[in-house]
C-alpha cells in the first residue's frame, strides 16, 4: 500500500448544546493515501461534513486520533494549524458565501500566499498562474466575486485551495450548488488537477454519482457511523450494506426503461425491509 | 463589461441622496468655521466690555451682537464650537476605543469574555448617565473634558452591542472558515474579513453617538454644572437663558448651532445607513437562495398569497437574465468545452417543427394550453424578456417535465401560469388557457379564485414554506374550510386523512406539531397534502424534491405518482434532474435561455435527443456514467497511445 497521508482512527465528535450532548460521529476509522480520492457519501445528518471539518481543525474531535504525515494533529495548536495549512486545504459547498464579497479575486487568492510570508510581487505572479490553472481569464483578478457565476466562483475557491500547493484538499460538497453542465466541468477540473499535482482529496457529497465519478475509494456514512467502505466499483455498483443499496436505488436513472426497473427493485427492497421490521 | 455597468459604490449612493448631502454640507460648514475661529472671529471671545452689553445683532464689530457681559457672540459661537465639538469627539473616541475592541473580541471568541462583557455592558447601560455625570462633577470638579471622558465610557455599550452582533453574524460565514484554513492569524482575519463587515454599522453608530454626546454635554452646561470658564455652546445657552427677558435673541444662536449639528448628524447617519443597506440587501438576496413561499401560497388555496415572498424565489431564477452585473462572463465556462459554444445560437423554438405540438392553435382537450407565452421584466429600453414564445399543453392525467438549468426560464413560465409573477414581471404576449379560460387577461383576484381547486402549487423548499408560528394542522385545514366550505371538524378529519394518505405515520401528532418539529421530508409531504387537498385539476411542482435527501426523494416521487394517477391530475414538474424526469414524466419540454428548445414524449427524448442542448445536458448527467477507475484507465490508455 502506498504511503498514508492522513489516518483517522476511531474519531468521535460530540456536540453539546444547552447541556444535552449529541453524538455526531462515532468510531470513524479510515485513511487517505498520497494522490488518491476518498469519497465520503451520506445524507443530511450523517456527519460527513463534520468529518471534514474536524480534519481541518474547525471542529475539535472528542475522541480518537488524527495523524497527518506521521504526526498527531488531533489537538494541534493554532500555530501548528497555520503550518498545516500549507499541506491541507478546503473547497466549500456554497460558492456564494465562501468568498468574501468585498475582496477582489486577487485579494482572495493572494491571502493564503501572503499569510505564508510570500512577498507581494511573487504573490501576484502566482495568482496569475492559479487563474490560468482553473481556466479563468487573467483579467478576473481585479473583479469582485459577485461578477461571476456559481461555476466560476467555485473555480476561484479551487484556485484558493491550490495556492499553497497542498497535499490534501477537503472538498465539502463542492459541486452540489452548481448546474448540471457546470458540475461536470468542475468535477473534471478536480480530476485533472489531481493528475497534474498528485494531491489527495477527501471528497464529501450526498450524491453517489458524483462520488463515483471522482473517487478511488468510497465510505458510506449513516447517522454518524460508517456502514460500508471499499473500492468505488464495488460500493457504487454492487453494495453489500442494505442502506447503501437503498441509497443507490433511490437515485433515479436518466433513462425511463432502466429507471422503471430500478424503481421496481427499490420497491422490493422497501417491502423486504418493512417485512423485516 | 463597460465600467458604467459596475455596481455603484456606497459613496455614490450616499451622494445621490440630496438630504444626506445637505446634512454633510451643513456639518462641514460648522466644523470648518469652528476650526478657523481665530481667522473668522475677529474678536476675543473672552474680552468683556460691560458698556457694550446686550448689543443687538449687526452692531459695529459685533455681527451677532454681544451677551450680558459684553462679549462678542459671533466669536464665542465659533470658539465655543471648538470646545463643544472637541468635547463630543472625545466622548466618541473613548466610546469607540472601549466598545469596538470589546465587541470584536466578544463576538469573535465568545466564551467567558463574552459573558463578562455583556454583563458589564448591561451594568453601564442601566446606570442613569446624567446622575453619574453630576456625581463626577461633584467629586472631580467642573471640567468638560473629564465629564466627556466619563460620558464616553457610558456610551461605549452603544458601539459594543452593534459590533458584537455584526461579528457574530459574520463569524459563521464560510469565507471566515476558509481564511482560518488558509493559515491566517486571528488578527488578520479580524482585520480583513470582520472589520470590513462591521465598518458600516460603526460609522452609522458614530454619527448618532456624536449627536448624543453633544446634546448631553450642552444639557449639562445649560443646567449650570459645566465648566463656565470656557466658551461653549452649552454655556452660551445657560447665559442666554439667564437673560431671556432682556435679550431673548442671545438664546437663539447656540440653540441653532446645537440643533443644526445634531440634525445634520442624524441625517448623515440615516443617509449612510440607506447607502450601506442597499448594498447589503442585494448581496443578501443572492446569498439567501430559493426560499420562502408561505404555506398558504403553496397550498394555493387561501386568498391571501404572500407575493412578496414569492418574488425572491422567482427573481433568483431570473437573476442571470435580468441583472447585467451578475452573469458577466459565462464565456469562460464555455471555453472549457467546445461543444457548448455553438449553443450560443439557440434556434427558434423547436415546437414549430419537431414536436407533436405543431398546431399553433390552443388544444381544447388540454387542461392547460399555453401559446407563444412571453414574460418580460421592466419596461422601455431596459426591459428584459425572460421567457420567449413558449407553447405547451398538459392533459388530464399527464405529467409534463419542464427541464432546464438555472436561468432557463422554467420557474418564470410556471409562475406566469400561476399568475404569481414577481413585481415588475408580466406576460407581454401569448395566451394561457386553463380549461378554456384565458388567464392572461384575468385580474389577479380572479386568478386567485382558481388556486387550490383549479391550480395548486408545490414549492422547492418545504421548510421555509410552512409558517413557523402556526401548527401544521391549522395550515392544512384553513384552506379547506375556505375553499371547500368544510366546517372545522370536517376539515380536521379530512386533513388527518390526507396526512395519512401522504404516508405520515402518526397523523394526529403531525397535525398538532409546529413546522420546526418535523423533518424536511415530512414538511414536503405536508405541503403535498395541502396542494392536493382541494383536488386541483392542475398541479405545478417547482423542483419539489431538490431540497430533499435522495432516499426521501424516491418516496416523495412515489407519492406524487400515486396521487397523480388517483386524482387524474395534470402535472407540470419543474426540475433540473433528468433522473426525476425519467422516473415520473410522460412528456418533457427542455428549456434554455427562455425558450423551449425541444419537446417530446419521455421515451423518445431520452432515446433520440434532437437538439444539441438536450444532448449536452443528457451527456452531463453522471448517473450511470463511468467510475473514477474507468476514467483513470481511459486516461492511462490515452497516454499509452
Where are these regions (language model features)?
Chain A
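ABC transporter nucleotide-binding domains
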Residues: 1-250, 262-277
Amino acid at each position: 500500500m502506498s504511503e498514508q497521508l492522513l489516518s483517522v482512527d476511531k474519531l468521535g465528535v460530540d456536540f453539546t448544546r444547552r447541556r444535552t450532548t449529541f453524538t455526531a460521529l462515532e468510531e470513524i476509522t479510515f485513511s487517505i493515501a498520497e494522490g488518491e480520492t476518498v469519497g465520503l457519501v451520506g445524507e443530511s445528518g450523517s456527519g460527513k461534513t463534520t468529518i471534514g471539518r474536524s480534519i481541518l481543525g474547525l471542529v475539535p474531535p472528542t475522541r480518537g486520533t488524527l495523524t497527518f504525515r506521521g504526526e498527531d494533529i488531533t489537538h494541534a495548536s493554532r500555530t501548528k494549524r497555520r503550518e498545516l495549512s500549507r499541506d491541507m486545504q478546503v473547497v466549500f459547498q456554497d460558492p456564494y458565501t465562501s468568498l468574501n464579497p468585498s475582496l477582489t479575486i486577487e485579494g482572495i487568492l493572494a491571502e493564503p500566499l501572503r499569510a505564508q510570508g510570500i512577498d507581494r510581487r511573487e504573490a501576484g505572479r502566482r495568482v496569475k498562474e492559479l487563474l490560468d490553472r482553473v481556466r479563468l481569464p487573467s483579467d478576473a483578478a481585479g473583479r469582485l466575486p459577485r461578477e461571476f457565476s456559481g461555476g466560476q466562483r467555485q473555480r476561484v475557491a479551487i484556485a484558493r485551495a491550490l495556492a499553497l500547493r497542498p497535499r490534501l484538499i477537503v472538498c465539502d460538497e463542492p459541486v452540489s450548488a452548481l448546474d448540471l453542465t457546470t458540475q461536470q466541468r468542475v468535477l473534471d477540473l478536480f480530476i485533472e488537477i489531481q493528475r497534474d499535482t498528485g494531491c489527495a482529496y477527501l471528497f464529501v457529497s450526498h450524491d453517489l454519482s458524483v462520488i463515483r465519478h471522482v473517487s478511488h475509494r468510497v465510505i458510506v456514512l449513516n447517522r454518524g457511523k460508517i456502514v460500508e467502505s471499499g473500492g468505488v466499483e464495488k460500493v457504487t455498483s454492487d453494495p453489500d450494506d442494505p442502506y447503501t443499496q437503498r441509497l443507490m436505488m433511490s437515485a433515479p436513472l436518466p433513462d425511463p426503461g432502466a429507471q422503471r426497473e430500478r424503481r421496481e427493485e427499490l420497491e422490493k427492497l422497501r417491502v423486504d425491509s418493512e417485512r423485516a421490521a | 463589461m463597460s465600467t458604467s455597468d459596475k455596481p455603484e459604490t456606497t459613496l455614490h449612493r450616499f451622494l445621490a441622496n440630496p438630504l444626506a448631502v445637505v446634512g454633510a454640507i451643513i456639518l462641514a460648514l460648522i466644523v470648518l468655521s469652528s476650526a478657523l475661529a481665530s481667522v473668522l472671529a475677529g474678536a476675543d471671545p473672552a474680552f468683556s466690555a460691560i458698556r457694550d452689553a446686550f448689543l443687538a445683532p449687526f452692531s459695529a464689530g459685533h455681527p451677532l451682537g454681544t451677551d450680558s457681559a459684553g462679549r462678542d457672540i459671533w466669536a464665542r459661537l465659533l470658539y465655543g464650537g471648538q470646545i463643544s465639538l472637541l468635547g463630543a469627539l472625545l466622548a466618541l473616541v473613548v466610546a469607540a476605543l472601549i466598545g469596538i475592541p470589546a465587541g470584536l473580541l466578544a463576538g469573535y471568541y465568545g466564551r467567558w469574555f463574552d459573558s463578562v462583557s455583556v454583563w458589564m455592558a448591561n451594568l453601564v447601560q442601566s446606570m442613569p448617565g446624567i446622575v453619574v455625570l453630576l456625581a463626577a462633577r461633584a467629586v472631580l470638579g467642573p471640567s468638560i473634558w473629564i465629564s466627556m471622558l466619563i460620558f464616553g465610557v457610558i456610551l461605549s455599550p452603544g458601539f459594543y452591542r452593534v459590533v458584537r452582533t455584526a461579528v457574530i453574524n459574520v463569524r459563521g460565514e464560510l469565507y471566515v472558515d476558509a481564511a482560518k484554513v488558509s493559515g491566517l492569524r486571528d488578527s488578520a482575519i479580524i482585520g480583513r474579513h470582520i472589520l470590513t463587515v462591521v465598518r458600516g454599522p460603526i460609522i452609522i453608530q458614530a454619527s448618532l453617538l456624536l449627536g448624543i454626546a453633544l446634546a448631553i454635554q450642552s444639557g449639562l452646561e445649560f443646567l449650570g454644572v459645566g465648566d463656565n470658564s470656557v466658551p461653549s455652546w452649552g454655556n452660551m445657552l445657560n447665559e442666554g437663558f439667564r437673560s431671556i427677558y432682556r435679550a431673548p435673541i442671545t438664546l437663539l444662536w447656540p440653540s441653532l448651532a446645537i440643533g443644526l449639528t445634531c440634525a445634520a448628524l442624524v441625517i448623515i447617519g440615516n443617509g449612510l445607513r440607506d447607502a450601506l443597506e442597499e448594498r447589503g440587501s442585494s448581496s443578501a438576496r443572492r446569498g439567501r437562495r430559493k426560499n420562502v413561499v408561505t404555506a398558504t401560497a403553496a397550498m394555493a388555496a387561501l386568498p391571501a398569497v404572500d407575493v412578496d415572498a414569492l418574488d425572491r424565489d422567482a427573481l433568483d431564477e431570473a437573476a442571470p437574465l435580468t441583472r447585467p452585473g451578475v452573469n458577466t462572463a459565462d464565456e469562460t465556462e464555455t471555453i472549457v468545452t467546445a461543444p457548448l459554444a455553438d449553443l450560443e445560437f439557440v434556434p427558434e423554438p423547436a415546437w414549430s417543427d419537431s414536436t407533436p405540438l405543431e398546431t399553433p392553435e390552443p388544444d381544447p382537450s388540454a387542461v392547460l394550453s399555453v401559446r407563444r407565452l412571453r414574460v418580460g421584466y421592466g419596461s422601455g429600453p431596459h426591459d428584459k424578456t425572460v421567457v420567449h414564445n413558449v407553447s405547451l399543453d398538459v392533459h388530464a392525467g399527464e405529467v409534463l417535465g419542464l427541464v432546464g438549468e438555472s436561468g432557463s426560464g422554467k420557474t418564470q413560465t410556471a409562475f406566469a401560469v400561476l399568475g404569481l409573477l414577481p413585481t415588475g414581471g408580466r406576460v407581454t404576449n401569448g395566451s394561457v388557457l386553463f380549461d378554456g379560460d384565458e388567464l392572461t387577461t384575468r385580474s389577479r383576484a380572479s386568478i386567485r379564485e382558481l388556486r387550490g381547486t383549479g391550480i395548486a402549487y408545490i414549492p422547492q423548499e418545504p421548510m421555509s414554506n410552512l409558517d413557523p408560528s402556526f401548527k401544521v394542522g391549522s395550515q392544512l385545514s384553513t384552506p379547506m374550510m375556505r375553499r371547500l366550505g368544510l366546517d372545522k371538524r370536517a376539515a380536521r378529519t379530512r386533513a388527518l386523512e390526507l396526512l395519512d394518505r401522504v404516508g405520515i405515520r402518526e397523523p394526529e401528532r403531525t397535525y398538532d406539531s409546529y413546522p420546526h418539529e418535523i423533518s424536511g421530508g415530512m414538511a414536503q409531504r405536508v405541503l403535498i397534502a395541502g396542494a392536493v387537498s382541494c383536488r386541483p385539476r392542475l398541479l405545478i411542482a417547482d423542483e419539489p424534491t431538490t431540497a430533499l435527501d435522495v432516499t426521501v426523494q424516491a418516496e416523495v416521487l412515489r407519492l406524487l405518482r400515486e396521487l397523480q394517477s388517483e386524482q387524474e391530475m395534470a402535472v407540470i414538474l419543474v426540475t433540473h434532474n433528468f433522473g426525476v424526469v425519467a422516473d415520473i414524466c410522460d412528456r418533457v419540454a427542455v428549456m434554455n435561455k427562455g425558450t423551449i428548445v425541444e419537446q417530446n414524449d419521455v421515451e423518445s427524448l431520452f432515446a433520440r435527443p434532437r437538439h444539441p442542448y438536450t444532448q449536452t445536458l443528457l451527456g452531463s448527467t453522471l448517473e450511470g456514467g463511468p467510475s473514477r477507475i474507468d476514467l483513470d484507465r481511459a486516461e492511462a490508455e490515452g497516454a499509452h497511445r
